[in-house]
Amino acid sequence: MPLALTLLLLSGLGAPGGWGCLQCDPLVLEALGHLRSALIPSRFQLEQLQARAGAVLMGMEGPFFRDYALNVFVGKVETNQLDLVASFVKNQTQHLMGNSLKDEPLLEELVTLRANVIKEFKKVLISYELKACNPKLCRLLKEEVLDCLHCQRITPKCIHKKYCFVDRQPRVALQYQMDSKYPRNQALLGILISVSLAVFVFVVIVVSACTYRQNRKLLLQ
């Protein structure tokens, strides 16, 4: 793996508050670490494949799940449901270490693992947010909740509707809006230029016709 990529990923792992949600469970981190040690580099002959596989696994060990929970959802999840996702991760890592796949087929399995973990994680995030954002259901919540930002177990509370199921990435949204307006402005400019050229050509034709008629009259006199 390139040194720069390794340092970048390790800095994400070592930074305070770099872990969250799934990474709050030390057994999940241990399972992912063991999987990485077992597969890389022994099961990848090409350095490029080693780097890609390492990036997938170390990304899962880093702050990705915390950022996903905070930027897309409210960043909290019921601990009993999160435990199920953690067990899923540990079982899947054991399965991958036990098979004989190598190189590209193994890399594809790692990418599939990440996608499946995200899918399961998303389910529990949505499940809690649906209940916590419901004014009637939220008061009935009793199960302990994990704060993904601080890795702290907290008491469930009702969440104001303005914080429910919203995209908390204004910079990305702003950039998207600017990019989406640019093609429309370009199209409008193109239309204006086309209309202006059409009017100009029409005026030239009219002037030419009038000049021709005047010259013809002079010739006939």
UniProtKB/Swiss-Prot annotation:
InterPro entries: IZUMO, IZUMO2
Topology Cytoplasmic: residue spans: 208-221
Source domain of life: Eukaryota
TM spans (from-to): 187-207
Keywords of this entry: Glycoprotein, Membrane, Signal, Transmembrane, Transmembrane helix
GO CC aspect terms: membrane
Annotated compartments: Membrane
Primary location recorded for the protein, binned into one broad class: membrane
Protein topology in the membrane: Single-pass type I membrane protein
Sites where a glycan is attached: N91
Keyword Disulfide bond: no
Signal peptide positions on this chain: 1-20
Chain ranges on the Extracellular side, renumbered to this chain: 21-186
Further comment found in the protein's record: Izumo is the name of a Japanese shrine to marriage.
Family, as annotated: Belongs to the Izumo family.
Protein name, per record: Izumo sperm-egg fusion protein 2
Biological source species: Homo sapiens (Human)
